[in-house]
Curated annotation (Swiss-Prot):
The lineage of its organism: Eukaryota, Fungi, Dikarya, Ascomycota, Saccharomycotina. Its main location: secreted. Keywords: Cleavage on pair of basic residues, Glycoprotein, Hydrolase, Protease, Secreted, Serine protease, Signal, Zymogen. GO terms for molecular function: serine-type endopeptidase activity. It is an enzyme of class 3 (hydrolase). Residues 1-15 form the signal peptide. It comes from Yarrowia lipolytica (strain CLIB 122 / E 150). This is Alkaline extracellular protease. Optimum temperature is 40 degrees Celsius. Residues 166-454 form the Peptidase S8 domain.
């Protein structure tokens, strides 16, 4: 089984088998099918409920080889999906260990148009039959590892300038890198509320950096609504902490998909699907949203298809490019950044505007799938160990939330609800040609910028 790396600096370690996930707080209720496709959608939900029941208390072992992710093409109709599900049901013996374990569904769409796919345990015969379909993609579940270790031990626009110790905030608010006397320059207060989903290891919501703006959304990793690793809390602090965050006004929603250093891709996809459904269900009153995922894994057509749905719904996605010092086009979902408007793949630079290089041959990924670079070396942010502590980490995991926070900031200061593509253009096209050209290796010469400081 291939291991994937998510993007702070360390080597990958496999976690123990995942415990059964806790129920997702505030999760959307089961869909009540409505509309012309109601019968087809109802039949889909019926099969999913029947097959998944046998796995209710199943603990996912990361070494299992027979788990698969199935994602339907965006062109597939609800009737076509229902037909494929019925075919699958005819192949699954009720007493066997085969079957759908969970759905990848957006139940806010009660006509079934949000049924994106499913995860299941299937033998080779069933997998071969599934692959005969022209309207779906079938792939083995893979492992995404989350290395998480400190990199070091320790009208008229109303403009606000704040002295900061965090060089990253200074960099994204100036055209050129500053040398000391760092200051974060931005518009004083966003006029419109935003929501930022952090799909990660959870958030220490009680940390003083968050001022009550961080909440638990869903937990697909274990039964503890706590960040036991620190990765998610650090990321959230960069997105929206009051001292170290880009947008200190955004609401932060924790979507936990990592309990240990590793998680199944299927679990990450479930977290993503929950976040997208939650955003859609609240979009009428809170339309300005972003999602941060500081991780990735081997190329996955099913994941790429699934995550592309976010921008169609109006949710901007920021993704870390990776720390392997290789072409970012080799990882998912970061490989879709360069070609999908509204999904931003983020590389890392250091305080001297050089593409980040770390010990052990690690460095920021690069190439045409990278959309923009942002500060990722020696970043100070919130610690998971106390309600007031800080930690210093490095990686594209740290660059990514600078961009997610910047996207939230742009959404908050504009009266018009900008599309993900419009926000991406503001971030990636406002500060170009400023990096040394020697090691770009096909990457864009662009640094994330808020358009304020000179």
């Amino acid at each position: 089984m291939k291991l994937a790396t998510a993007f702070t600096i360390l080597t990958a370690v496999l976690a123990a088998p995942l415990a059964a996930p806790a129920p997702a707080p505030d999760a959307a209720p089961a869909a009540v099918p409505e509309g012309p496709a109601a019968a087809a959608y109802s039949s889909i939900l019926s099969v999913v409920a029947k097959q998944s029941k046998k796995f209710k208390h199943h603990k996912r072992d990361l070494d299992e080889k027979d788990q698969f992710i199935v994602v339907f093409d965006s062109s597939a109709t609800v009737d076509q999906i229902a037909s494929e599900i019925q075919k699958l049901d005819s192949l699954v013996d009720e007493d066997s260990s085969n079957g759908i374990t969970s759905a990848l569904d957006l139940p806010v769409y009660t006509d079934g148009s949000g049924f994106l796919g499913f995860v299941g345990k299937f033998n080779s015969t069933i997998v071969d039959k599934l692959k005969e379909s022209s309207v779906l993609t079938v792939e083995p579940d893979t492992i995404v590892s989350l290395p998480e270790i400190p990199a070091s031990s320790n009208a008229k626009r109303a403009i606000q300038t704040t002295p900061v110790t965090q060089w990253g905030l200074s960099r994204i608010s100036h055209k050129k890198a500053q040398t000391g006397n760092y200051a974060y320059v931005r518009e004083t207060v966003g006029k419109h509320p935003t929501v930022s989903y952090v799909v990660d290891s959870g958030i220490r919501t009680t940390h003083s950096e968050f001022g009550g703006r961080a909440v638990w959304g869903a937990n697909f990793a274990d039964t503890q609504n706590a960040d036991l690793l620190g990765h998610g809390t650090h990321v959230a602090g960069t997105v929206g902490g009051k001292t170290y965050g880009v947008d200190a006004n955004t609401k932060l929603v924790a979507v936990k998909v990592f309990a240990g250093r590793s998680a199944a891709l299927s679990v990450i996809n479930q977290g993503f699907t929950w976040a997208l459904n939650d955003y859609i269900s609240k979009r009428d009153t809170l339309p300005r949203g972003v999602l941060n995922f500081s991780g990735g894994g081997p190329k996955s057509a099913s994941q790429d298809a699934l995550w592309s749905r976010a921008t169609q719904e109006g949710l901007l996605v920021a993704i870390a490019a990776g720390n392997d010092a290789v072409d970012a086009c080799n990882d998912s979902p970061g490989n879709i950044g360069g070609s999908t408007s509204g999904i931003i793949t983020v590389g890392s630079i250091d305080s001297s505007d050089k593409i980040s290089v770390w010990s052990g041959g690690q460095g920021s990924n690069y190439g045409t799938c990278v959309d923009v670079f942002a500060p990722g070396s020696d970043i100070i942010s919130a610690s998971y160990q106390s309600d007031s502590g800080t930690l210093v980490y490095s990686g594209t995991s740290m660059a990514c939330p600078h961009v997610a926070g910047l996207a939230s900031y742009y959404l908050s200061i504009n009266d018009e609800v900008l599309t993900p593509a419009q926000v991406e253009a503001l971030i990636t096209e406002s500060n170009t040609g400023v990096l040394p050209t020697t090691n770009l290796k096909g990457s864009p010469n662009a640094v994330a910028y808020n358009g304020v400081g000179i």
